[in-house]
């Protein structure tokens, strides 16, 4: 709190939960696999209130497409999912909003948030410009720093197999 705003980055959901429980001011960000996809639920005619059933059927945000390319007037157009809210716009209680993005946006706009390594690296590598005003926090604390190297390699590493090398000899 001393610095005014921060990111805390940790390796596991259990640590995120522990931090969030102990430090109530932290807003956690969980991955897409932890949330039911409203779009897929809609397609399967599952009530929005029945997220437990959707999760049991594997209808997670990880599997739903947030952006699709469609044809309009002979041109390819990218369309966002109707449930994906826009960051910075006031919350509309009359409209269903994606649970994953709601919690992610709450964390981005909160002074202090807690992320897992994969989500944090994803944010900083691919979405830094899109969320520029929200990611310029003065401090990032990496818990379990002894795992940082492994986490970076897991995020951006390349697997090289002997079969591929044999082809070039």
Q: What does each of the following model-derived ranges do?
A:
Residues 1:
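Walker A/P-loop
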Residues 4-113, 117-121, 166:
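A substrate-engagement module of RecA-like helicase motors
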Residues 9, 140-141:
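Residue-level marker for buried hydrophobic side chains located in beta-strands
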Residues 120, 147-150:
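Residues immediately C-terminal
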Residues 130-137:
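Short, conserved loop/helix-junction motifs that constitute active-site signature segments
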Residues 144:
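Walker B catalytic acidic pair
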Residues 151-169:
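Conserved phosphoryl-transfer catalytic core
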